[in-house]
Amino acid sequence: MTNIEASAAKRATRTFTCSDITPDEMDAFSATHPQGNFQQASGMGRVRQANGVAVSYLGFYENGELVAATQFEVHGHGLGTFAEVHDGPLADFHDRELTSYVFSQLRARAKAAGAAQLVVTPEKPYRTRNSAGEPLDAEGASLAGVPAGVETGPDDEGIASITSCGLAHEGFPVGYQAVPRWRYLKDLTGLADDKALLASYSKNTKRNVRIAHDNGVVVRRIGRDELGLFHDICELSCEKQGFENKPVSYFEQIYDAMGDAAEFNVAFIDTAEHLAIWEKKRDAFAADIAKLEKSLETARTPEKVERKLADVRKKHEAALRRVETAHKYETVGAHIPAAAALFIWHPRECVYLFSGSDATYAKFYAATAIQHHVMGECIERGCMRYNFYGINGVFDNPNDPGRGLLEFKQGFEGYVEELMGYFEMPVRPAV
């Protein structure tokens, strides 16, 4: 038998089966699959169940080997029932036989649950882009900081495989969606320490990290009893950007369901430290002034000394003002919360999910400090994929409402994944 005949015989004898799997089995599969993500793990399953969603885990086997899996959700009741798969299923969509089997089983499950339709958003990039949103080829991917081996796309083959199973593709829209189609990421491979990490950022972001550090900003992981504070900081940003904040109870559900995988961080201004920093600078400038004034008496080129003296006096006056402001901050509290962010850890990546900041303290760059802190934690843990999560996919409009968020993330010098997007399959005829 020739190799071609053997390959054909193998395809002809492929046998697939589907069965329920345990949450632990789902987590193990998600941990090692190239599309594995926190939405396709049991922690988010528990969060959804706490909100009334029926959740199950399905495994797809070929000749006894688990080759695909998914968290399967059923929402609503009666005529409003629909089935959904967030950031899944985890499968090789270039394998058309497997893809066809997976979606036939998902449709059957959805139909048995009384769902009118099935909605899926695969965690599969359609195209990889550079930080400015420009499509990449294999050579450009290396220059843009994309990890080796990542497909640049476009993955028209994968989309064709899915649509051949009876699902309609939404297309390639821009804008924010419930499941972000546009993601901003940073590859941390090769960054051995904090110094190397900082050096990888843009000039402005490097400066902002240093400003935060030099002004007494400290990042601390908070406990469940402080989630009200986390919510309140997020509320400040939601009001400004026109988004609806999640209730405290939702953050409590994430905390309870995900355990150590959910990291709630708050960046505080240590007001005593902030005051001490500026008092030290004030005193140093005062000492410099005294030295320069003394040297002026015997200087050969007094005009140069006068220029230096004028510069130091300006810095001293600025330091005096900062000391005065620092005293006012002390009246607010010993530790002023300035920014907050939630991160979800998955064996494949760390995801930046929710955040907020107090614009009153914008010049402390506390939000930047949090990102730098957690990326440093990624390096310590050996997690090389840092997922800034959603952007809106608009790169060419400086007046776009999402521009500020995009530029904030771009400052960390990453790259963009444009995912396939939404697919929908009717399950029962419209009434």
Could you tell me what each predicted segment is?
Residues 79-176, 338-340, 344-412:
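Acyl-donor binding region in acyl/amide transferases
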Residues 122-123, 172-176, 221-225, 389-390, ...:
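Acidic carboxylate-rich catalytic motifs and surrounding loops in phosphoryl-/glycosyl-chemistry enzymes
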Residues 34, 93, 110, 114, ...:
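Secondary-structure transition/hinge residues
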Residues 130-132, 182-183, 232-234, 398-400, ...:
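Short secondary-structure transition/capping segments
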Residues 17-79, 125-127, 165-178, 183-362:
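A conserved beta-strand-loop-helix scaffold within acyl/acetyltransferase catalytic domains
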Residues 3-8, 57, 391-431:
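C-terminal catalytic domain of photolyase/cryptochrome flavoproteins
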